[in-house]
Amino acid sequence: MTKTTFYYDFSSPYSYLAAERISGLFAEAGVEQPEWKPISFGHILKTTGRRPWSFEEDRSVDFEEIQRRADERGLPEVVYPEGWPVDNYSLNPTRAAIYAKESGRVVSFSLACFRQVFAGGRDMSDVDNVLIAAAACELHPNAVLKGIETSSIKDKLRAATDEALALGLEGIPTTAVGDELFWGDDHLEEAVRAASGV
């Protein structure tokens, strides 16, 4: 069976929207769940020289689209933390997600983290907020705090990000079905069909 991977970063509201529904879409299709793989989108942008939509003058169009999708799906009003997307960008939540993955809790941690950011408007550069998300999925805060500082966790995040770059990933969220990339929350259904072999 073709491997499917979901690449994301907690700075992305479109990743939040995708994270809230990707598991359900794959389950409904009877397809094996994708591997959740957090990456450093900041490093992707720096390496590729791409400019994110959140820096553009017409970004209000995206804000409206994000809220429209959230409303359609019964999600809370989308809130952006003060300083988003640059001033409060941090690798702490992504490193914590890598740590959670080792405990089999990457999905529950990631959802808790996304909800902290875009439903609660909380700044994830504040490690206390990362630890609240960790506690919500029964990860011990002290263990997470130690884990995100270890070289092995940092190396795994770096390796995941390099893997995404090697595949040709340009934006997030991206769902990779084998070598085929589906960029965006609005292309999840296509990714599911590809994973289903349809």
Question: What are the language-model segments listed below?
Answer:
Residues 14-117:
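Structural alpha/beta surface segment adjacent to cysteine/selenocysteine redox centers
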Residues 4-5, 10-32, 112-198:
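C-terminal cap of thioredoxin/glutaredoxin-like
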